[in-house]
Amino acid sequence: MSISKAIAADLLEIKAVSLSPSQPFTWASGIKSPIYTDNRVTLAYPEVRSQIEGAFAELIKTEFPEVEVIAGTATAGIPHGAIIADYLKLPFAYIRSKPKDHGAGNQVEGRVAKGQKMVVVEDLISTGGSVLEAVAAAEREGADVLGVVAIFTYELEKANSKFADADVKLATLTNYSELIEIAKETGYVTKEELELLKKFKENQETWQA
């Protein structure tokens, strides 16, 4: 089994990802979805966490070999980013969703030199808006952001377009396609539910159970 599928299987097993095609979730954006993800759950499982961070380290070495500093997004990207930085023996920083309203007013916390090559760590990519705002904040403070890594992506077309428009490279450990394939192979969903899950990938904006 590939590392991508192995991680997808782990996310299902520990219920970091929940699938409910017949009784969909409603995201904050208003999108009706057959899937809900809370990757913070992975932190409670040492073996899963270790596999994720090791896979992240290998992914970064392959996709972004020039990296000089790891940055996590607040708050979900911080624990993963800190562990990855330790794996890679690199400096770590984190990026707030907005600047502090007191003190120095920092948005990027830590020491990042002008032109330092950075990879930003996020746990989940949905529409991509928040992590791209973090990338922009890091770049305003002088970082040279090589790209973004994440555990999981819903593969929304909106996110793909945003990353393309921003000219930011995205690399993830696993994705929606791999996850529903694993769900099928393990009997996690019925044939009818699988079809609903596939339809969501084809058109998330208009999908209905």
From Swiss-Prot:
The keyword Acetylation does not apply. Pathway: Pyrimidine metabolism; UMP biosynthesis via de novo pathway; UMP from orotate: step 1/2. Belongs to the purine/pyrimidine phosphoribosyltransferase family. PyrE subfamily. PANTHER family: OROTATE PHOSPHORIBOSYLTRANSFERASE, URIDINE 5'-MONOPHOSPHATE SYNTHASE. CDD domains: PRTases_typeI. GO terms for molecular function: magnesium ion binding; orotate phosphoribosyltransferase activity. The keyword Mitochondrion does not apply. SUPFAM superfamilies: PRTase-like. Catalyzes the transfer of a ribosyl phosphate group from 5-phosphoribose 1-diphosphate to orotate, leading to the formation of orotidine monophosphate (OMP). Gene3D superfamilies: 3.40.50.2020. It catalyses: orotidine 5'-phosphate + diphosphate = orotate + 5-phospho-alpha-D-ribose 1-diphosphate. Pfam families: Pribosyltran. Its EC number is 2.4.2.10. This is Orotate phosphoribosyltransferase. 5-phospho-alpha-D-ribose 1-diphosphate binds at R96, K100, H102, E122, D123, L124, I125, S126, T127, G128, G129, S130. InterPro entries: OPRT, Or_phspho_trans_dom, PRibTrfase_dom, PRTase-like. It is an enzyme of class 2 (transferase). Orotate binds at S126. GO terms for biological process: 'de novo' UMP biosynthetic process; pyrimidine nucleobase biosynthetic process. Its cofactor is Mg(2+). Homodimer. Keywords: Glycosyltransferase, Magnesium, Pyrimidine biosynthesis, Transferase.
